[in-house]
Amino acid sequence: QDHFFFFFKNTFQNVNYNRAARERQWVADSVLVNVDVFPNTSLQNAYFINGTMQDYAVCSGTPPLHVAVIDPSTFESWGTNYNGANPDHDFGNTLCRSRVEKFFIFYQNSAQQLQAFQNMVLNEVPDGHYLLIYAAITASYTSWNQLDSVNMYQTFAALGSDSIIPGRPDRPFAFFTRKGYPNTVVEQVIDPTTGAGSENNYASIHMNAYMPTSISNGAETSTLIGPSMKWKAAYWQQVSIDPINNA
């Protein structure tokens, strides 16, 4: 790896890969979470931590709720129970791909899935952990009203939402909080008349939220290097943009 663009497939932890500025950026006092939510099955439905994609896309055309859980100590996303990994992360969610996923899928047209969603976010996720919930394709309030007209809205109210309420039209939303800390809520819903809350008055959402941190280190992990019969040496060169203090 030599050219800066070659590094975009690396994995970053507590380091933000800024391709446009060609910089690795360290933000010592916060970690950025952002999410893109589209009113369709776009592969661009995705969320990121400090610029590193955690997971993306939707599994089918059935509107899901995607739930991401972020550990407040490591700022790493929980993974799903798959093939022996994360055996304690089975919350009644739907599994989509043949790998560990970094969000938990709950379909909005199933009463059983809605109940499993409520149990997960209220009872299985510890206080202090970060929750990102987004409705890719659409929030199916119509289904909520038919299947569980009280508990779904009460669940979001218990998490601190004041915008995910009865009477909303079916549109995507994004919701973020540190569980147990209602003052940390960041949420975005779309006004179908004015387009307020959407990206450029379209039906998509781009939302940013921040997680305060005192972490003083980060990591960058490259993709697999090779194959090769033998490696003799590895070299790393870095030019810091910060002033050098020799005092």
Regions found by a protein language model. Name each.
Residues 69, 119-126, 179-180, 220-230:
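Extracellular and analogous surface-interaction loops
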Residues 128, 171-173, 232:
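Structural beta-strand/beta-sheet cores of well-ordered domains, especially the beta-sheet scaffolds
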Residues 69, 134, 176-177, 236:
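Hydrophobic side chains in beta-strands
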Residues 1-38, 59-61, 200-247:
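Beta-strand-rich ligand- or partner-binding modules
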Residues 73, 138, 181, 228, ...:
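Short loop/turn segments at secondary-structure transitions that flank enzyme active sites
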Residues 14-77, 182, 186-205:
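N-terminal, charge-rich interaction modules
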Residues 139-211:
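Contiguous ligand/interfacial binding patches
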Residues 45-131, 136-138, 142-143:
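Conserved mixed alpha/beta catalytic, RNA-binding, or beta-rich assembly cores of soluble enzyme
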